[in-house]
């Protein structure tokens, strides 16, 4: 990629600090015990994990289970392992260079190409936001009976949520997000237990099947799962928020320790996200696969299935279906927090443009609400069409992903830039393989889709 102009003479200290209001604000002492160091770095991974279990993951995983049983568990496994590798690369990028991925991309691309990458990054954040709008609007409908259009409009005002929470410090944000994540996890562990999945079929789902490639329907959902699992905005987000910890920016030793514990944090939280996504697909498969409604598997279907589940009874079924809707709303609001931060990182990093957070959030959320409102009007509130829009947004994220991965790969494999923290050879091989395979699958899917129009 000839437009990359890596220059070892660039001075990182001339860069504006990423997310300056939280950068270098949380204590980390390299002389502490291993457990204290781990606790000091426990947090950024939680915010990243949110993106791996947002409403986009819910619908793609549930539909994958409803339509194709446990076949796509293998895709969730591979996506999660790939995500751990890629997020570890963003950790090293942020800590080793003092720049986030957006700053790095802008710094080492010529201006026209950097603008193109910025536009794609912004569209990816809007696509992520569409999933949050739809998930939150459906949750409001399920809990309070609020019409979808009204619910979608209400989500515009959650712009003020992060602004309020930020007043209490970044650690409080991490704690709130972590609490909501474990709430969602607990709900789905119980609900999957009630749904009585086939354990042997589940285990077989982690074995690759050729139908994933040969069946366009399965491939479409698989790309949606990949897009919902490995999300572009998370790469920008993670490379920035790991810099919130205090460590000597000039010490190789302290940077190495920071990278070590930030990576452990990331892998632990992404393992939790992996379990949640497997539970989501399992729930869809256990309730719908092999029945007359196997082509559904949307939020409303799952809500109704839980509410009318004979094994639960009327009272417990009502409680569990309500908890499902509450978890969906919590997931959407959780993603709002991380989406806001990622949007700020992308705009400031690519454009060196700093605007009030409330205005930035209002613009992004408004751009996400518009297509949802249009879809609701055109299809007269058809919930199935709205859920299809959510799946499409996740497929777009998969298509946009290489535009984040390529700069990340090129930057983290550069000796002058990364020094002793550059990618090992095996990481370069795997990351380039991921980029090539994902790009090839995207091209194939687009061609097949247009041929059937």
Curated annotation (Swiss-Prot):
Keywords: Cell membrane, Ion transport, Membrane, Symport, Transmembrane, Transmembrane helix, Transport. The chain crosses the membrane at residues 39-59, 66-86, 114-134, 146-166, 175-195, 217-237, 270-290, 310-330, 362-382, 388-408, 427-447. It is found in: Cell membrane. GO terms for cellular component: plasma membrane. It is a multi-pass membrane protein. Belongs to the NRAMP family. One of its GO terms (molecular function) is cadmium ion transmembrane transporter activity. H(+)-stimulated, divalent metal cation uptake system. GO terms for biological process: iron ion transmembrane transport. Disulfide bonds: none annotated. This is Divalent metal cation transporter MntH. Pfam families: Nramp.
